[in-house]
Amino acid sequence: MAPTRRSRDLLRGKNVLIIGGTSGIGFAVAQLVIEHGAMACIAGSNPTKLGKALDALKQHPDRDPIAIVQSATCDLFDVPNLEQNLDNLLKLAAGDSKIHHIVFTAADMVQPPPLASVTIEQIQRVGTIRFTAPMLVAKLLPKYMELCPENSYTLTSGSHAKQPDPGWSLVTGYCGGVEGLMRGLAVDMMPLRVNVVSPGAVLTPVLRDILGDSLEIALDAARKKSTTGRIARPEDVAEAYLYIMKDQNITGTVLETSAGMLLR
């Protein structure tokens, strides 16, 4: 009987692209990836944040000695050049070989506008990063990734898709759209595995910026709504993405990591 590979070895030497890997959940995924001996390419639109994230990953104390880290700037709001920007990103991440896993965590994390005042421009802007960009990645990735069950493409939605909060219709709509897109891609791109991670409340730097003085009130409400009584950290949720990369039997699935908030 052939020896069983350790779970930690399943990502060793693999090439992982994290789009939105400069902070929050995406950055936490990158940390886990390099702890497992994989090459991580993080992509973001802000060169300053990208540089700081790259330096932090290179200095990560638990980084496996064989892990390689690189970064790439990619403006997901540059609609006229979006497809070319993404193609350039995928080409850079693939290098002389192929990409094995792609994680898409990028999002326009701002307080959504009230329904009564939402504009076409705002609808399109949110849709560009949450729906259009992930779909274009799917269109382009066969040039840079082998479509096989060992590889994966993981998108991100949110608990809003199943349990909307007042005033979040714009984000709720696209979260649901991403989950539908994932199912379509899982069929169109088989046997490549395509899945979605759906986080609940996660305490990220961006969330702190959005909520400002209302942060503690919002966190207290989220704790009471959950069954665990706690708010997730990015590193908690990042484990869901690692699981999807490793489990070659999971595809077409929304993996909820929401502290039981959907139960109440």
UniProtKB/Swiss-Prot annotation:
Q: Which UniProt keywords apply?
A: Glycoprotein, Membrane, NADP, Oxidoreductase, Transmembrane, Transmembrane helix
* Stretches that traverse the bilayer: 13-35
Pathway in which this enzyme or protein is active = Alkaloid biosynthesis
Choose one Gene Ontology CC annotation of this protein and give it: membrane
Report the enzyme's class at the first EC level: oxidoreductase
Q: What is its EC number?
A: 1.1.-.-
GO MF term list: oxidoreductase activity
Membrane disposition: Single-pass membrane protein
Top-level lineage group: Eukaryota
* Location of the protein in the cell: Membrane
UniProt cross-references to InterPro entries, sorted A to Z: NAD(P)-bd_dom_sf, SDR_fam, SDR_superfamily_enzyme
Biotech applications: Malbrancheamides have the ability to inhibit calmodulin, calmodulin-dependent phosphodiesterase (PDE1), and induce both endothelium-independent and endothelium-dependent relaxant effects, suggesting their potential as vasorelaxant agents.
Report residues carrying sugar chains: N249
Chief site of localization: membrane
Kindly give the CDD domains that the UniProt entry links to this protein. SDR_c (cd05233)
Q: Which residues bind NADP(+)?
A: T22, S23, I25, S45, N46, K49, D75, N88, R130, V202, T204
Pfam families, A to Z: SDR
| Reactions catalysed according to its record | 1-hydroxy-3-{[2-(1,1-dimethylallyl)-indol-3-yl]methyl}-6H,7H,8H-5lambda(5)-pyrrolo[1,2-a]pyrazine + NADPH + H(+) = 1-hydroxy-3-{[2-(1,1-dimethylallyl)-indol-3-yl]methyl}-4H,6H,7H,8H-pyrrolo[1,2-a]pyrazine + NADP(+); 1-hydroxy-3-{[2-(1,1-dimethylallyl)-indol-3-yl]methyl}-4H,6H,7H,8H-pyrrolo[1,2-a]pyrazine = (+)-premalbrancheamide
What function is annotated for this protein? Answer: Short-chain dehydrogenase/reductase; part of the gene cluster that mediates the biosynthesis of malbrancheamide, a dichlorinated fungal indole alkaloid that belongs to a family of natural products containing a characteristic bicyclo[2.2.2]diazaoctane core. The first step of malbrancheamide biosynthesis involves coupling of L-proline and L-tryptophan by malG, a bimodular NRPS, to produce L-Pro-L-Trp aldehyde through reductive offloading.
Q: Which family does it belong to?
A: Belongs to the short-chain dehydrogenases/reductases (SDR) family.
Q: What is this protein called?
A: Short-chain dehydrogenase/reductase malC
- Say which species the protein is native to: Malbranchea aurantiaca
| Organismal lineage | Eukaryota, Fungi, Dikarya, Ascomycota, Pezizomycotina
